[in-house]
Amino acid sequence: MTLLPKKPCKSKAKGLLLGALFTSFLLLLYSYVVPPLYPNMAFTTSEAAAPCSPIPNEPVAATPANGSAGGCQPRRDIVFMKTHKTASSTLLNILFRFGQKHELKFAFPNGRNDFHYPSYFARSLVQDYRPGACFNIICNHMRFHYEEVRGLVRPGATFITVIRDPARLFESSFHYFGSVVPLTWKLSSRDKLAEFLQDPDRYYDPSSYNAHYLRNLLFFDLGYDSSLDPASPRVQEHILEVERRFHLVLLQEYFDESLVLLRELLCWDLEDVLYFKLNARRDSPVPRLSGELYRRATAWNLLDVRLYRHFNASFWRKVEAFGRERMAREVAELRQANEHMRHICIDGGQAVGAEAIQDSAMQPWQPLGIKSILGYNLKKSIGPQHEQLCRRMLTPEIQYLSDLGANLWVTKLWKFLRDFLRW
């Protein structure tokens, strides 16, 4: 008599129970990792809000930049307001290298690679913060809160940020963050971005989870209300406030020219601003914005458009003051030096997809559900003169933060879970 196999009821029940427990754990972790969107403007208590107190007679800058005009001193106290999808990861690498080279003190987030974004920045979020502590460089993603940031740096600190054509920024943000913005899940077209732009008011809800990624993201990152009426006088007031607070607003589209101005402002050496493009996205199978869709994306992000137009104009005034011919010479010098380093450092001479990256230490962070961010392979035979610089120039943000001593336990746990679940 043939016995029928027993149904694995107990195994299924155990699997369901484990799945439920694991899901509950993920939800609990997620509720801790992702902060509320609109908390109070500042978390720091009045007792802990003591301003930065430099050590008496502590030098602000120790060594003059080689060949710098007028014997200026390199600036070492820098606040970089790291905006999203603006080549900011490339600029971050430049700041990491400079800070590491000169043994400067970074203000890092505690447990993550951002300051609990999209919450407003508070100095209490800084790793190992103590009232009165001073830091040289603040450069991780945050939602900007000027007073809180100001309390962590010396009075002479340089404030910089970078912006981008709002339509292009919207396109990049939509593709990168779309999978974690639930309002996009109802879009059924292959080209979800085009479908969204046909009637954005139909889909968009400013109170929806992560909706801030899909409208006026620059305005939001800088700490302002991204749902303001574009005709409101508050918009221009905010733009002028940014102009007063920031010494330089870089343009992503003119990144090399921006770095020349930044080098002049900070009195740095050419080597300090060399770079490889980091966190770049693989070409999408969906065509880039053009024509009518570009116009729709621009109209959808009018606050950012006003901000961009203002600082685009001021940027070119700075270029004129710097000198057009001098700018052309120094941009050519920077590009030649970058090309020289590319031949020395990069295996194959160009960025590759995630699947082709051989060293996990060079693997960039990927968006949920798709490996669209490019990275590099380091050449195996690099002379001792360039080996350290090459590795530092190519190291992605998360790995570099760890190298610099940042506590990233939440980010690393999240990566482990994503790898385990193959997200």
Swiss-Prot record:
Database matches in InterPro entries: Gal-3-0_sulfotransfrase, P-loop_NTPase
Cellular component, GO annotation: Golgi membrane; membrane
Membrane topology: Single-pass type II membrane protein
GO-annotated molecular function: galactosylceramide sulfotransferase activity
Subcellular location: Golgi apparatus membrane
Residues in compartment: Cytoplasmic: 1-12
PANTHER family documented for this protein: GALACTOSE-3-O-SULFOTRANSFERASE (PTHR14647), GALACTOSYLCERAMIDE SULFOTRANSFERASE (PTHR14647:SF56)
Protein name stated in the entry: Galactosylceramide sulfotransferase
Gene: Gal3st1
